[in-house]
């Protein structure tokens, strides 16, 4: 199985606005203009072998041998105001992973927005309850509470169980996967740039490729076509990122800044 999953966040009217999702310099690095997003969608339509896939639960993966998945993290307001209509005009599904404590707050989607996405056939999943800075470093009981609280809130809004989620901040660990499984999640998306799907104690773990404001149009085409060189580049940079993450401090800040400049989140 070879899946290319792209991670998007928020779409802004222009580079100077900031009316969707979390605020701050780090968050801004992942926010695109709608013009850039429109270009990406056009390139995906031209270069993808098939239309983007919909993976809402484990059984969906059994039917997918390869393909492209579009995912959107955090639950910013642009999910319904700018993203959904663009996907729906092409009959494409999106995967919207929502930080449940922020539902209805300024800059984030409301319960009504989530129901609209669900009714339109998009996947609405969890992105934790509070978006902890490093979820993998929390006590296991607290990680489980993040998943349980988020899934319960979203399920109550949608009227159906939540089976998919993405890891906030990319801080994945085995405990993060196991607690997600215990909360009823069967498909967990990470930020590790891999096209492989692994099984961790009964939960499918799916890698993803980050899209930042510096990601070039050429790179979107290469990712869409799953070219070996671009996949290897993302893997190499991710390996360096993991090493420096463990060190933290100024070294991590410097590396993260350089990764953004290279267009790799």
What is the predicted function of each stretch?
Residues 2-12, 34-37:
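N-terminal anchoring/stem segment of glycosyltransferases
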């Amino acid at each position: 199985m070879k899946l290319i999953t792209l991670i998007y966040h928020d779409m802004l009217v222009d580079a100077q606005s900031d009316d969707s999702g979390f605020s701050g310099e780090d968050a801004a690095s992942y926010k695109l203009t709608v013009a850039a997003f429109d270009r990406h969608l056009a390139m995906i339509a031209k270069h993808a072998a098939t239309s983007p896939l919909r993976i809402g639960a484990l059984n969906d993966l059994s039917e997918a041998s390869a393909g492209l998945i579009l995912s959107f993290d955090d639950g910013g307001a642009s999910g319904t105001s700018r993203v959904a209509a663009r996907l729906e005009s092409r009959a494409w599904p999106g995967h919207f992973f929502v930080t449940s404590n922020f539902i209805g707050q300024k800059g984030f989607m409301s319960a009504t927005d989530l129901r609209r996405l669900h009714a339109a056939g998009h996947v609405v999943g969890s992105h934790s309850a509070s978006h902890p800075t490093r979820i993998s470093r929390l006590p296991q009981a607290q990680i489980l509470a993040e998943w349980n609280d988020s899934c319960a809130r979203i399920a109550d809004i949608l009227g159906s169980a939540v089976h998919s989620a993405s890891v906030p901040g990319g801080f994945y660990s085995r405990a993060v996967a196991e607690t997600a499984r215990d909360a009823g999640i069967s498909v967990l998306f990470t930020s590790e740039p891999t096209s492989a799907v692994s099984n961790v104690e009964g939960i499918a773990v799916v890698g993803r490729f980050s899209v930042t404001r510096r990601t070039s149009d050429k790179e979107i085409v290469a990712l869409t076509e799953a070219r070996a060189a671009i996949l290897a580049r993302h893997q190499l940079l991710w390996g360096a990122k993991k090493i420096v993450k463990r060190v933290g401090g100024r070294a991590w800040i410097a590396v993260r800044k350089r990764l953004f400049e290279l267009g790799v989140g």
